[in-house]
C-alpha cells in the first residue's frame, strides 16, 4: 500500500488491543459453537462460550505463526496467545484496517522475539505504525479490497474444483 497518503498513527491509538484469556486445552472439543483462536492460523479447538464478538481482527501473539492477521466474522474465544483489536475509533474503517494489517503481516511477524516459543509483545503491536487516509478514502479502498478478496476466494474454489475433476478423470483414464 505504498503511495497511500494520510496521517501516520500508532495502532494502539486507533483501536483497543486486548490479549485473550487462556483456557485449558483439555476442555476444548473438536466441534462446537465457537472456535478458539490462539497462536496459530487455524482454531485450536471449539468451546461452548465466546469472549470476543464477530467482525473482529485478531493477530496471533505467540508460536511459529505469531503476527498472523485474521478477520473473524463470527464470535470466537480469544485465547492467551491472541490479540483482538476492539473499539476502533470513529476515524477508522475497520475493513480498511484489516486489509492494511494483512498487507503489513510480514512486518508484524518481524516483531517476534524469542526462539523457543516466539511471541510479539503488546508494546510492539501498540506502537505499530499505520498510514491512515481520510475516512472516505479508507472506505473506497476497503470496498475495492473486499471485492478483490471475494473474487480471489471464488477463483481459488474454482481452481480446487478443477484439480479434483482432473484427479477424477486421471483415475478413470488409468483404471
State where each predicted segment sits.
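Non-catalytic DNA-recognition/assembly elements of restriction-modification systems
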Residues: 1-22, 26-38, 127, 132-135, ...
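Residues within well-ordered alpha-helical secondary structure of globular protein domains
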Residues: 17, 103, 144-147
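A short beta-sheet element
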Residues: 38-104, 113-114, 121-125
Amino acid at each position: 500500500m505504498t503511495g497511500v497518503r494520510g496521517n501516520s498513527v500508532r495502532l494502539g491509538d486507533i483501536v483497543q488491543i486486548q490479549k485473550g484469556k487462556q483456557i485449558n486445552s483439555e476442555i476444548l472439543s473438536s466441534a462446537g459453537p465457537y472456535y478458539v483462536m490462539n497462536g496459530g492460523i487455524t482454531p485450536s479447538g471449539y468451546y461452548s462460550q465466546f469472549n470476543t464478538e464477530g467482525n473482529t481482527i485478531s493477530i496471533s501473539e505467540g508460536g511459529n505463526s505469531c503476527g498472523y492477521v485474521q478477520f473473524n466474522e463470527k464470535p470466537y474465544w480469544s485465547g492467551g496467545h491472541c490479540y483482538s483489536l476492539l473499539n476502533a475509533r470513529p476515524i477508522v474503517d475497520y475493513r480498511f484496517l484489516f486489509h492494511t494489517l494483512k498487507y503489513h503481516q510480514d512486518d508484524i511477524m518481524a516483531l517476534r522475539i524469542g526462539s523457543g516459543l516466539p511471541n510479539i509483545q503488546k508494546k510492539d503491536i501498540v506502537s505499530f505504525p499505520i498510514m491512515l487516509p481520510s475516512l472516505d478514502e479508507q472506505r473506497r479502498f476497503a470496498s475495492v479490497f473486499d471485492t478483490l478478496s471475494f473474487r480471489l476466494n471464488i477463483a481459488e474454489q474454482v481452481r480446487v474444483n478443477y484439480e479434483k475433476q482432473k484427479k477424477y478423470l486421471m483415475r478413470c483414464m488409468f483404471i
